Amino acid sequence: MVVLGSTGSIGKNALKIAKKFGIEIEALSCGKNIALINEQIQVFKPKKVAILDPSDLNDLEPLGAEVFVGLEGIDAMIEECTSNLVLNAIVGVAGLKASFKSLQRNKKLALANKESLVSAGHLLDISQITPIDSEHFGLWALLQNKTLKPKSLIISASGGAFRDTPLEFIPIQNAQNALKHPNWSMGSKITIDSASMVNKLFEILETYWLFGASLKIDALIERSSIVHALVEFEDNSIIAHLASADMQLPISYAIDPKLASLSASIKPLDLYALSAIKFEPISMERYTLWCYKDLLLENPKLGVVLNASNEVAMEKFLNKEIAFGGLIQTISQALESYDKMPFKLSSLEEVLELDKEVRERFKNVAGV
């Protein structure tokens, strides 16, 4: 298999599972963590390696592997790989081209890069994609029951770092506080997306493309991150998917469902410890971006605008140029600006063009 973004949280877990399953790693790619990819090269002996920045070439120790550089290099590497499976754990819209290239080459795509579906779900062959996400894995598992007819799909949110912060203090929060996730250990972008509820807007759009534009789609807060997804059926019964908060479960099924079903990759649940589970609505007062959920479901191509404005605002937030309120404000302004515009977006080039336009337009918006 090929692992793109091998030095991140998902990538590291994927390599752990590949080793457990005895799967050979043909190629690896990383962004800036050259020290870690050097370690991974020693353990997994890939035939090909891609790094983002040519200035890191001197520090790379490829041990005879063919080396590729930049986003174009990742594309060229995928083109040459013979593996049937590509796991895309690249963060941000940078991973979009890699998803397209993998599907063009008729490879199975294990997808942790949310931005691919959020920005271009209408252009991707969903039948070749397995999402790496606890909520979508939960929905997939629940929808295996073909006798019952689904009516609505519900995914859960933890509430993120500011779920108990007094409302008046939320706009002035900094990145350091936003990174204190109550349940999950994840990369910085997805942890902050969890605090803003952008992550759940992403997952709502992913659900739309993956499982059914015709079904009602919603989310709720379940603080323990034990209930990942629920499906309500036409007979008004509801089935929930419960599992420990551990990404190794969806990763293992994305890599090899058969092997994943034969052995445990996560610790068992203690049912007697689950008495505290309760469901809460997502408050628009606390999570102001949640008010755009219905707009995004009505016009899912707005996902390009959501993602581009979020990435621009995220960079400024992490660089301490704006506070949390400024991040929210930038995304709101972007969605309000584009919500009446008709989008065709009939090619990857058009998606990337709109992405670039939104970034240019909102990179200098003054924030809180």
From Swiss-Prot:
Pathway: Isoprenoid biosynthesis; isopentenyl diphosphate biosynthesis via DXP pathway; isopentenyl diphosphate from 1-deoxy-D-xylulose 5-phosphate: step 1/6. It catalyses: 2-C-methyl-D-erythritol 4-phosphate + NADP(+) = 1-deoxy-D-xylulose 5-phosphate + NADPH + H(+). Keywords: Isoprene biosynthesis, Manganese, Metal-binding, NADP, Oxidoreductase. GO terms for biological process: isopentenyl diphosphate biosynthetic process, methylerythritol 4-phosphate pathway involved in terpenoid biosynthetic process. GO terms for molecular function: 1-deoxy-D-xylulose-5-phosphate reductoisomerase activity; manganese ion binding; NADPH binding. Pfam families: DXP_redisom_C, DXP_reductoisom, DXPR_C. Its EC number is 1.1.1.267. Disulfide bonds: none annotated. NADPH binds at T7, G8, S9, I10, G31, K32, N33, N113, E115, G187. 1-deoxy-D-xylulose 5-phosphate binds at K114, S134, E135, S158, H181, S194, N199, K200, E203. Catalyzes the NADPH-dependent rearrangement and reduction of 1-deoxy-D-xylulose-5-phosphate (DXP) to 2-C-methyl-D-erythritol 4-phosphate (MEP). This is 1-deoxy-D-xylulose 5-phosphate reductoisomerase. It comes from Helicobacter pylori (strain ATCC 700392 / 26695).
